[in-house]
Regions:
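Membrane-helix interface and helix-disruption motif detector
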Residues: 1-10, 57-75, 91-96, 113-127
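N-terminal signal-anchor/start-transfer transmembrane helix
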Residues: 5-31
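C-terminal ends of transmembrane helices
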Residues: 22-35, 83-92
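Membrane-helix boundary elements
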Residues: 34-69
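Short, amphipathic, aromatic/basic-enriched membrane-interface segments that mark the entry/exit
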Residues: 36-46, 88-100
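Hydrophobic, membrane-inserted alpha-helices
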Residues: 50-60, 103-115
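Alpha-helical transmembrane segments and their membrane-interface exit regions
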Residues: 75-86, 127-140
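Short, highly charged, low-complexity non-transmembrane loops/tails of multi-pass membrane proteins
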Residues: 140-165
């Protein structure tokens, strides 16, 4: 059981990285549909946050089962703060908008990864950093709000995809 959990902990960053490289700036039907729904509906953004939270809860549980320490408690508190949709929206939005903040978050995640007992905090920071890339920016949401002037939905979709990342 513990070996399986450690295998999950080991493979998790690579799975997230593979998903990132498979979906980032790809011009296929799935990506266009994802960008459209994330921009147009608030419920899609909530579902995205729930999926991120579910993966973080799984990783916190895995870290607790293998090495219970204070860093796991800190990671669980950080994950618990994201249960508020306003907080999660604000965090993902700030990470997406401010590239310097995003870079610092990923650098801190790498530092936490190099320290053995801080692995659980690495998972939280790394997941938030990657998830923020796929979260719509304020500019894209403004384009959606100004969509009254655009009569063609395909033109609106092209503008959204152009400014999404």
């Amino acid at each position: 059981m513990i070996q399986t959990i450690q295998l999950i902990k080991l493979c998790y960053p690579f799975i997230i990285l593979a998903v990132f490289f498979c979906l980032y700036k790809k011009d296929n039907r799935i990506t266009r549909k994802f960008c459209w729904r994330m921009t147009m509906t608030h419920s899609a953004r909530k579902l995205f946050v729930i999926a991120v939270l579910a993966s973080l809860i799984l990783m916190n549980w895995c870290c607790y089962m293998t090495d219970p320490n204070w860093a796991v408690l800190l990671a669980a508190i950080m994950t618990g703060c994201l249960f508020s949709n306003k907080v999660a929206d604000r965090v993902l939005n700030r990470l997406h908008e401010r590239k310097r903040f995003w870079t610092l978050t990923l650098m801190l995640a790498l530092i936490c990864y190099s320290i053995p007992y801080m692995n659980s905090i690495f998972h939280v920071l790394y997941t938030l950093g990657v998830a923020s890339v796929f979260y719509p920016s304020e500019r894209v949401l403004r384009i959606k709000d100004e969509a009254n002037g655009i009569s063609n939905p395909k033109e609106l979709l092209q503008r959204i995809i152009h400014y999404y990342y």
